[in-house]
Amino acid sequence: MSKKIALLAGDGIGPEIIAEAVKVLAALGEHGELDVVLESGLIGGAAYEVTGTPLPAETLALAQDSDAILLGAVGGPQWETLDIKVRPEKGLLGIRSALGLFANLRPAILYPQLVGASTLKPEVVSGLDLMIVRELTGGIYFGQPRGVCRLEHGERQGFNTLVYKESEIRRIAQVAFTIAMKRDRRVCSVDKANVLEATELWREVMSEVAAEFPEVELSHMYVDNAAMQLVRAPKQFDVVVTTNMFGDILSDCAAMLTGSIGMLPSASLDQSGRGMYEPIHGSAPDIAGQGIANPLATILSVAMMLRYSLDSPAQATRLEKAVGAVLDQGLRTPDIYSPGTTQVSTGAMGDAVVEAFIHTPG
């Protein structure tokens, strides 16, 4: 039975990196025993220019009718002055909300070939492989009431509300523990339970869910300490699970441990495992159209798609090995280039991954 994948290239370098992912998906169809149907839609600034909205109804319908979504990137300086309701990023948020994509998975893996690209010492980061599981649809980003008001004496006051329901915490905990079962079986829950009541509940529910997974070791850590530990000794972590805002911050911190955000994929999943997959880097309008963007994060997002939404973990591992093989060959896009390696274009990197995939045992 075929799997339908929605391709949402978006803005900036989005179309270029999605084009390389399409090459990989074609190879999967020919050499990976996976039947996929690809259909494209508009999102972000590209959609706004054509339809006046960053998320056209047709794109949302396509996303809802697909087994998985592959997103390039959204945004650019030419849209920053638009009303916030129609800015490109609203298209991304709209899909997350409409599809109930509550679990954001952000792996931080340092490939041994790129250990010199990290700003930390090799002995600190060599072998790094952690997963941050971020709750994506609750917390202070969505809590009500929120806004800016004017007090009686004329001073302005801004306010937001941090709210989490027990059910929201429980479901993200179950995602984290399930992932940990397939890894090193350790979960670190990050909160600020010493000052925030909402995360005191977070800690309680995490401990309750841990009882359902006796094989997994649960630890708790305050977010300020977690930020410090990510820099001091990041390899102590296996799976980190945390709130929306804390995860937003910590995942970017973890990303830079690897030396280049051009290597890092992400997934946003619903309750059933359907998901949207995207590189964590932005639309990079400054290099768009130059053929120098790194497509590996997008290709690795395809690997995550295979693992979490398309029930093809063996092909996911095969694709990840192909990326490693290309790095072993010394091929690099400019963002990960170093003396002694060979600089290649976006398209050449994609072609090399396809070739390596074909010759990697399934």
From Swiss-Prot:
InterPro entries: IsoCit/isopropylmalate_DH_CS (IPR019818), IsoPropMal-DH-like_dom (IPR024084), Isopropylmalate_DH (IPR004429). Keywords: Amino-acid biosynthesis, Branched-chain amino acid biosynthesis, Cytoplasm, Leucine biosynthesis, Magnesium, Manganese, Metal-binding, NAD, Oxidoreductase. The keyword Glycoprotein does not apply. Its EC number is 1.1.1.85. The record marks 141, 192 as: Important for catalysis. Binds 1 Mg(2+) or Mn(2+) ion per subunit. Pathway: Amino-acid biosynthesis; L-leucine biosynthesis; L-leucine from 3-methyl-2-oxobutanoate: step 3/4. PROSITE patterns: IDH_IMDH (PS00470). Substrate binds at residues 96, 106, 134, 224. It comes from the Bacteria. NAD(+) binds at residues 76-89, 282-294. GO terms for molecular function: 3-isopropylmalate dehydrogenase activity; magnesium ion binding; NAD binding. The keyword Magnesium applies. It catalyses: (2R,3S)-3-isopropylmalate + NAD(+) = 4-methyl-2-oxopentanoate + CO2 + NADH. NCBIfam families: leuB. HAMAP family: LeuB_type1 (MF_01033). Belongs to the isocitrate and isopropylmalate dehydrogenases family. LeuB type 1 subfamily. This is 3-isopropylmalate dehydrogenase. It comes from Nitrosococcus oceani (strain ATCC 19707 / BCRC 17464 / JCM 30415 / NCIMB 11848 / C-107).
